[in-house]
């Protein structure tokens, strides 16, 4: 052994070892340069296609000679390479690799099956042809390499999140056969880890110096040109790593993981190939490392692979049986945690868990959502209702203002449901097994002393890639060595089981898990948000009418297969980079096409159900109006009269979950006792609308100067202020353009001033009064709006059309209220949250832009003002000002985001008493669910009919559908929730022929103790605050 000098300098010793393993410096004489030995060329041919062809079709194409250095492209095309190789006889007994480096993402095909992904960005640049070449092995072989013209994270022009460069070209830089020296690889791993220990523990730690001196001795012993020196060097490393830690060492549970965004900086179709590249690589690793477990979420991606790569899918199922491939999450996709409705969140689990049960024999026990932009306070209840009590995520480590205080804790939801939550303390779902990451997992843990276990997700992610053999080798060496936490390769189930054993001292977080970042995603790509809201409602209506038709018609077949397809499209669009608008233009276009598919087929199914529902009943031909919520509706609706299709208004009353005939010219109801709408335009150009419930005054530019609750004379608009005030903000974030709106945007507020004289009267009163105006927002953008007040309606509507052509601007509308309150209320899934004024401490201040669904409310003791909407999500309440976020104009990753024409409606509702007493929730449902007017193909009923009603206004009947596993196809599922935040006993009335009623969970599994007795066509139900309850109703066969 070479003698070490008496004194050693820490830095020079450290850097000496660094250079010995460097892939950049001194590779002509260092160890890294010996990783590969002898090599030989391969014969290449290729063909280029704009399509993503299946293997069977691709290999039939005409291939032309190709060589290293060739360029191909452009972006989103595919280049297929035929690789013909001959392995030299002298390589028998050696490990042989195909070395491949190219721009883009590659997939190796062997014998017609995908076998491994190759991507420079994912540190996968060689494919193992043989771990030890045998004399009997074939020497000649033909492989195919499918190269996608996009990188692991898309093809952004100039930066990762920039819009894709459509002209980008790609190049093949290496293709050869080479002998791989596994002993060199092992030494490189040892030395890298020793350097990591030395650096991570620092110069004041004895074990740090021990690691550094061990590495130095290895360099002294190891001559890269003489492999016979390697074993002695490796023995020094083994001795170091063989020194065990104490019993109190923290245990890290390392799980292989490959986060693949279902669409983001690449289109949906490319994700299918990303799955094949990533998961075929994981299969090879599972074959070579029997202790390695790989967690995989998102049923949609598995279904894609099942359909397009059946051989690979069969391997995944086999490794699932062995316990190495572990399905997690339980959802169809890793959805956004804010914007989807409560019912849509339930369907994520319903579709996902049923898929995992059918395909892998069991449901998931962990909810897995590592990357999303916030977490609704109703998720714990939804998880528990779907058989899940464990939750893993890490996105809150991105918080901009406040550091979240826990990594392992209980999360208590809106109704009191609790789940065990773990954030891997390394603050990443894409670890690589370095010492730095392992140490951070311990030092960064905010629950030290409460639990001695942590998760560690390793593998390249976001764009796929997944784990590598090098990552596994690192983690194995760190299994139990002094100075480091214990590392064991575990499954998510093993991690949570260990955490549950230590859960007695864990803290509890109550309410929403709010991400203090990415709050621009509540508004970006407004058309995607609108499509989401509309399609959620269309599917609600199709299920409702189909269920009622099923109950009343023996001939009607519930469209279960069609509805599953449409629901899965909607759930796909609710992926956390799609509905949020943080995706490229190609993805947004695909999503809009999916919405159109849902609309088109949904409306066809609606018409079929309506026709079946009333078939055979006596009455005149014409229209029927359907009420699709459990509330009686009194609405002014348009009725088409005459051959020319002229529209006139009529007042219609439709019962809860039922229908009524449309009025004819001879059956129009008198207005009394309701007061007709009064409209007056003053000489100064202002307009007053009054329906006896509220009185609205607009100034000549269309701003709201007064909103009075007539019965009390109470003014809702702050003195001297203007409501319906459009405001424009500069909107330039720090980096994440489509994602972020920063706090400083509030400092750039600019009111958009209209011109006096643009306000004109529209509808002149009676059943409806309105006024409209035009507003030039900027030289490039304009707005038109009709302000509408209907007879008997407690709110005024603002029908808005915007032509928007801006760059980094943010449009909002504001309503200063004559209300003083320290907190506002925001609707969320199956309930609401109350949040403090964001001008208080940092946890509130970070909520300067928040999300809500259909309404927000600001109330004091006996009066309040609610702001409703039909397709918006971003909002805020600062002081007494209610604000609705309308449109943004980011330029990355989609330069076209939000550009063009938009239509939307919001409404303002002053009210006496609390929002619960005033019926704000019902009003928001009415705004979002206008009466369905469907033609009667034959005789239509001339009487009203109601299928269900609920005795308490606090309980909302949200969903009526056929049960997923209805053996006789005669079982309905009803989902109800308590919306006021109160304990409620109520009656559910039904006119349907119910034979049996039972409580069930959200997966529609019967509660064995949940039998409900039917009394006079009524069921008694009990709710705690914000509780969601589901019922199974078995129907008697209809008479016809």
From Swiss-Prot:
Entry's Gene Ontology cellular component terms: cytosol
Sites where the protein binds Co(2+): 259, 261, 371, 576
SUPFAM superfamilies: Families 57/38 glycoside transferase middle domain, Galactose mutarotase-like, Glycoside hydrolase/deacetylase
List of catalytic residues: 371 (nucleophile)
Subcellular location: Cytoplasm
Keyword Metal-binding tagged: yes
Reactions catalysed, as given in the entry: Hydrolysis of terminal, non-reducing alpha-D-mannose residues in alpha-D-mannosides
Major location (coarse): cytoplasm
Domain of life per record: Eukaryota
Cofactor: Co(2+)
Alphabetically ordered keywords of this record: Cobalt, Cytoplasm, Glycosidase, Hydrolase, Metal-binding
GO biological process terms on file: mannose metabolic process; oligosaccharide catabolic process
An annotated Gene Ontology molecular function: carbohydrate binding
Function of the molecule: Cleaves alpha 1,2-, alpha 1,3-, and alpha 1,6-linked mannose residues from glycoproteins. Involved in the degradation of free oligosaccharides in the cytoplasm.
UniProt entry tagged with the keyword Ribosomal protein: no
A Pfam short name: Ams1-like_1st
SMART domains attached to this UniProt entry: Alpha-mann_mid
Protein name: Alpha-mannosidase 2C1
E.C. number(s) listed in UniProt: 3.2.1.24
Tissue expression from the record: Widely expressed. Highest expression in testis, adrenal gland, and kidney.
Similarity-based family: Belongs to the glycosyl hydrolase 38 family.
């Amino acid at each position: 052994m070479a003698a070490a000098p008496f004194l050693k300098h820490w830095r020079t010793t450290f850097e000496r070892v660094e250079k010995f393993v460097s892939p950049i410096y001194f590779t002509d004489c260092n160890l890294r340069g010996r990783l590969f030995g002898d090599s030989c060329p391969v014969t290449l041919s290729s063909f280029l296609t704009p399509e993503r062809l299946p293997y069977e079709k691709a290999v039939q194409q005409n291939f032309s000679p190709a060589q290293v250095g060739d360029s191909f492209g452009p972006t989103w095309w595919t280049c297929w390479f035929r690789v013909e190789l001959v392995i030299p006889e002298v390589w028998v007994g050696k490990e042989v690799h195909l070395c491949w480096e190219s721009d883009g993402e590659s997939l190796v095909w062997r014998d017609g099956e995908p076998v491994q992904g190759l991507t420079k960005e994912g540190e996968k640049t060689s494919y193992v042809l043989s771990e030890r070449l045998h004399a009997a092995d074939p020497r000649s072989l033909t492989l195919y390499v499918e190269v996608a013209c996009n990188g692991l994270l898309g093809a952004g022009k100039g930066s990762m999140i920039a819009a894709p460069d459509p002209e980008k070209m790609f190049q093949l830089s290496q293709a050869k056969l080479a002998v791989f020296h596994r002993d060199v690889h092992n030494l490189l791993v040892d030395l890298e880890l020793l350097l990591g220990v030395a650096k991570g523990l620092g110069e004041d730690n004895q074990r740090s110096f021990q690691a550094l001196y061990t590495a130095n001795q290895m360099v002294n012993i190891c001559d890269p040109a003489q492999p016979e020196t390697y074993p002695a060097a490796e023995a020094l490393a083994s001795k170091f790593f063989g020194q065990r830690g104490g019993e109190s060492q923290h245990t890290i549970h390392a799980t292989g993981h490959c986060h693949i965004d279902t669409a983001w900086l690449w289109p949906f179709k490319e994700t299918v190939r990303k799955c094949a590249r990533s998961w075929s690589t994981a299969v090879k690793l599972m074959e070579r490392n029997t202790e390695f477990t790989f967690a995989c979420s998102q049923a949609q991606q598995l279904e894609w692979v099942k359909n397009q790569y059946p051989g690979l899918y069969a391997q995944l199922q086999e490794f699932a049986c062995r316990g190495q491939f572990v399905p997690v999450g339980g959802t169809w996709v890793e959805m956004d945690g804010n914007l989807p409705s409560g019912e849509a969140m339930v369907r994520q689990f319903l579709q996902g868990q049923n898929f995992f049960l059918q395909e892998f024999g069991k449901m998931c026990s962990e909810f897995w959502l590592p990357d999303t932009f916030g977490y609704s306070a109703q998720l714990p209840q939804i998880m528990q209702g779907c058989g899940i009590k464990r939750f893993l995520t890490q996105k809150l480590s991105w918080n901009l203002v406040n550091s979240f205080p826990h990594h392992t804790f209980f999360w208590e939801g809106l109704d009191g449901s609790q789940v065990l939550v773990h954030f891997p303390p390394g603050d990443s779902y894409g670890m690589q097994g370095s010492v730095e990451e392992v140490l951070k997992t311990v030092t960064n843990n905010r629950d030290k002393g409460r639990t001695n276990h942590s998760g560690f997700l390793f593998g390249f992610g976001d764009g796929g890639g997944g784990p590598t053999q090098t990552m596994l080798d690192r983690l194995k060496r760190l299994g139990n060595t002094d100075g480091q936490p214990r590392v064991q390769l575990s499954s998510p189930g093993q991690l949570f089981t260990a955490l549950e054993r230590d859960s007695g001292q864990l803290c509890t977080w109550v309410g929403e898990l709010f991400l203090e970042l990415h709050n621009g995603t509540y508004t970006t790509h407004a058309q995607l948000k609108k499509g989401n809201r509309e399609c959620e409602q269309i599917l609600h209506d199709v299920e409702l009418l189909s269920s009622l038709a099923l109950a009343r018609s023996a001939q009607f077949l519930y469209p279960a297969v069609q509805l599953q397809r449409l629901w899965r499209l909607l759930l796909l669009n609710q992926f956390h980079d799609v509905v949020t608008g943080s995706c490229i233009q190609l993805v947004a276009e695909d999503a809009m096409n999916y919405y159109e598919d849902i609309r088109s087929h949904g409306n066809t199914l609606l018409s079929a159900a309506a026709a079946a529902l009333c078939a055979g009943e006596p009455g005149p031909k014409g229209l029927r109006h359907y009420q699709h919520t459990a509330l009686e509706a009194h609405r002014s609706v348009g009725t088409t009269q005459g051959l020319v299709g002229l529209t006139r208004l009529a007042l219609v009353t439709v019962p809860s979950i039922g229908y009524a005939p449309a009025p004819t010219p001879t059956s129009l109801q008198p207005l009394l006792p309701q007061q007709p709408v009064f409209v007056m335009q003053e000489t100064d150009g202002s307009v007053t609308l009054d329906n006896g419930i509220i009185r609205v005054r607009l100034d000549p530019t269309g701003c709201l100067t007064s909103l009075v609750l007539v019965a009390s004379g109470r003014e809702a608009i702050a003195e001297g202020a203007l409501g319906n005030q459009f405001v424009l903000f500069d909107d330039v974030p720090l980096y994440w353009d489509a994602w972020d709106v920063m706090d400083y945007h509030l400092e750039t507020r600019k009111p958009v001033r209209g011109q006096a004289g643009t306000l004109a009267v529209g509808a002149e009163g009676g059943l409806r009064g309105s006024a409209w105006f035009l507003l030039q927002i900027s030289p490039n953008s304009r707005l038109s709006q009709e302000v509408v007040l209907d007879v008997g309606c407690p709110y005024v509507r603002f029908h808005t059309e915007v032509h928007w052509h801006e760059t980094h601007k943010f449009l909002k509308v504001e309503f200063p209220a004559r209300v003083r309150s320290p907190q506002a209320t925001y609707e969320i899934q199956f309930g609401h949250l109350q949040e403090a004024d964001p001008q208080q401490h940092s946890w509130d201040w970070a909520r300067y832009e928040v999300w809500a669904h259909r309404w927000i409310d600001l109330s004091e003791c006996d009066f309040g003002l609610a702001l409703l909407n039909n397709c918006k999500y971003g909002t805020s309440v600062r002081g007494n000002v209610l604000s609705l976020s309308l449109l943004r104009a980011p330029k990355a990753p989609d330069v076209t985001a939000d550009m063009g024409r938009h239509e939307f409606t919001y409404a303002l509702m002053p009210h006496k008493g609390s929002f619960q007493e005033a019926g704000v929730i019902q009003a928001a449902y009415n705004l979002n669910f206008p009466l369905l007017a469907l033609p009667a193909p034959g005789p239509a009923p001339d009487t009203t009919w109601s299928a269900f009603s609920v005795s308490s206004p606090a309980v909302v009947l949200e969903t009526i559908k056929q049960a997923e596993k209805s053996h006789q196809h005669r079982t309905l599922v009803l989902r109800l929730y308590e919306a006021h935040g109160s304990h409620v006993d109520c009656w559910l009335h039904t006119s349907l022929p119910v034979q049996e009623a039972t409580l069930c969970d959200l997966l529609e599994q019967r509660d064995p103790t949940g039998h409900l007795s039917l009394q006079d066509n009524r069921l008694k139900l009990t709710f705690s605050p914000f509780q969601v309850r589901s019922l199974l109703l078995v129907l008697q066969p209809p008479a016809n």
